[in-house]
Structure formats: structure tokens, C-alpha cells
Amino acid sequence: MTSKTSADLPATAPAVAGTSAFVLVYHRSPFDEKIDADGTRHWVDQKSPNGIIPTLRNLFRSQRSGTWVAWRRQDEEGPSDDELVQMDPPNDFMLRRLPLTTKQISSFYHVTSKESFWPILHSFPSHFSVDNSDWCIFEEVNASFARA
């Protein structure tokens, strides 16, 4: 698997925004990233408790090309470029990882998504909770996914 930032790819690469025939947007990556002591990166199957990751990965089997858009946690001072990773066959798709800070992940995912939307979408309106102070971060993160 090759890791690059979007600036490293030629304009005709399939992972350039708006050019993939099939795009899947999901908050988690299709594989967990493991980095050895020598800096070598490996991708391993996720231990998804509900099986959604393997199911979503299977969607790419019938596609000639595609891009999976997910986030990656970044340090506050770290590089903020999107990362593009060409996954090896049989997972022949691009992984586009959007950099999100710990604060963005907490606000977007743990607060707004899990406490506000999930209870309603899963028919538990009594568990609905909202904190409008997180809404601007939710919009910011969604805009990043939309641009990808």
C-alpha cells in the first residue's frame, strides 16, 4: 500500500475529489493501521463488533474502482493534509483519510452523532441529547467529508 497526500498525486489519479466511480463515506477506516518499531505501516482487519466494516468492504468487490473516505486522528501540531492510500488487492480501492483533531472527533462523533442523531435514528428518542455548542464543529467536519 502506498501512502501519499493529495498534493502528491497527479491530477488524473482516481482518488482526486470527484473522480471515483464509487465513493463510500464512513467515519472509520476499513482496516486498522499498525506501525512497527521501524516505521513500517501495515493494515490489519478491524475487530468490528457489529460487522459493518467487512460488509462495507464487500461493496467494493463489484466496483472497478472506488474511494473509501474516513477520518484519521491527528495531533494538533501534525500535518493536516488528506492522506491517500492505495489499498492492495483484493481490496482494490483508494482510502482517503481526513485529518481530524481529538476535539473534532469528540464533538462530531461522540457528542453530536451519538448523543443527538443515533437515539432518534434507532428509535430511542428518550435518549436524545443536544448541545448546540458542538454544532459548528459538526458542520465543519461534514464540510470536510463533502469536499473529499
Model-inferred region functions:
Residues 1-106, 110:
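N-terminal low-complexity, Ser/Thr- and acidic-residue-enriched intrinsically disordered segments
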Residues 102-148:
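Conserved nucleotide-sugar donor-binding subdomain of glycosyltransferases
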